[in-house]
């Protein structure tokens, strides 16, 4: 190979690898189970059940991540979605969501944590839910209640 072509070939190979990694990045965020999604995070997990066609769910998902980041609590935020994989993939790409999402097509987590409607949040310590959204309380009240629960959990 000529000297001038070597850097071009190397750049093309690296670009191809980077492009391939970018395509697969969405796939790695879509998990088949809660265990897969929370792997490597020994602390509590905040499950955020959502739908891609629900603007309130979108707000709840991103506000949950913001709340955990702002409070600097060692909590993993994991989305839970039961709709079509293509809808989830498009959502993740459109909004650049980088945290894991469990694709729960059989609604195993929905049933386990008794989720009837979205948006809904549950804070898990191990497998026990120490916080569950109250569907009869508005979004602001639920946010404050979650914040109070996290504060009690970490600042005893």
Regions found by a protein language model. Give the residues of each.
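Bacterial N-terminal signal peptides
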Residues: 7-15
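Bacterial Sec-dependent signal peptides at the C-terminal "C-region" and cleavage site
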Residues: 14-24
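A short beta-strand-turn-helix
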Residues: 25-44
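Conserved helix-turn-beta segment immediately C-terminal to the redox Cys motif
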Residues: 43, 61-80
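Conserved redox-active cysteine motifs that mediate thiol-disulfide chemistry
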Residues: 49-63
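Thiol-based oxidoreductase modules, predominantly thioredoxin-like and allied folds used
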Residues: 75-87, 99-106
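Short, internal strand/loop/helix patches
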Residues: 95-125
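Thiol-/selenol-based redox modules, centered on thioredoxin-like
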Residues: 130-156
């Amino acid at each position: 190979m000529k000297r001038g072509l070597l850097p071009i070939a190397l750049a093309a190979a690296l670009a191809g690898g980077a492009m391939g990694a970018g395509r697969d990045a969405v796939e790695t965020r879509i998990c088949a189970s809660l265990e897969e999604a929370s792997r490597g995070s020994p602390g509590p997990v905040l499950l955020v059940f959502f739908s891609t066609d629900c603007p309130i769910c979108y707000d709840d998902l991103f506000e949950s991540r913001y709340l955990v980041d702002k409070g600097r609590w060692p909590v993993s935020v994991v989305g839970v979605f039961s709709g079509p994989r293509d809808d989830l993939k498009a959502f993740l790409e459109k909004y650049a969501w980088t945290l894991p999402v469990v694709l729960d097509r059989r609604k195993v987590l929905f049933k386990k944590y008794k989720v009837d409607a979205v948006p809904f949040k549950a804070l898990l310590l191990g497998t026990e839910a120490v916080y569950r959204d109250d569907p009869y309380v508005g979004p602001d009240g639920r946010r404050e209640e979650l914040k109070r629960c996290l504060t009690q959990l970490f600042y005893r």
